Amino acid sequence: SSISLCTPKKPFSILVPLGPEPLFIDLQDALLENRFKKISFHDELIGAQEIWSRGDDFVFLGRGRFTRWASWAEVGIANAGTATEQLVGLGVPVLSLPGKGPQFKSSFAIRQSRLLGGSVVPCKTSESLAERLNFLLNEESVRRSLGKIGSNRMGPAGGSIALARLISQFLELN
């Protein structure tokens, strides 16, 4: 798994905000294979439902925690277009790994990366994702540069509200 290939120079924490799937039990084997041990079932402060540790490294699992955790990230890993764009808008560089689903194919990831100025880096394999993740975690200046490019491309917060107001005004006039 990719986590076994992740070797940053300092201790790390991985925040895993989950949707309805996968189930926590589905992730358990990969964590155990990589010598992580479950240390807690719930943490109010962070909002994790499960916490796993391996020495000074931690994995936090939480269902529905994306909004809360996204701004804490140094690097994002995503396989969904909207989550990727939300992270980029927060100034977080993202590694994308196209999945098996119809909504996120390699061609989409490449176009998305181009539109977002390279702040999203599409990866074709788990190995290339781990290699790029290690690089970004160890190179703060590159992370900051990519984060700045991404947040500039996405623009400031509030775009959806402004667009809704414009549409509402247009509809009132017609």
Residue map of PLM features:
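Nucleotide-activated sugar donor-binding and catalytic core shared by glycosyltransferases
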Residues: 1-174
